[in-house]
């Protein structure tokens, strides 16, 4: 069984607060999730309902049979573009390491995302007093000045998808951290400016038959 400590980092909190503990187990290809609220969280914020599939009371709660991860973690998960990047990275690593490709679960996607650019207000730790997962300086968000390189990488990945082949690892490595946390199907990545302000950069797609970005700018 795998576990994560879940912290809320809402803008109205003075500091991140422990919400509870998320557990994950896969038995014979079937995923099961459990969650237990922190007593301190329930004491201070018991009137705040975070998810319609979790009740605000102490003790372990589980997802219904056949249901995926609890609803309020869904916003923190990558969508089609992010999952494509993470899946292709796993396929390339499996090929390089001469092993079968692992089946990735929502738990794997959750822990595969960079902390700074993760969508939503939840952050995760593997140990209560440890660092937030994927908060290392190595997993940096690229600057705006890298935008042309990121566009080239996204184009190469889309091209490989069209041709039903694996992309080169260098393209995946360039986009998997800044791009895997974002929702939607279009190629995109997180970037920061010189003031460390986070932006979402949407890229042209090989499938576009008009300038989608131009029209989104004015819509």
Per-region residue spans from a language model:
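Phosphate/dinucleotide-binding and metal-coordinating scaffold of catalytic cores
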Residues: 1-219
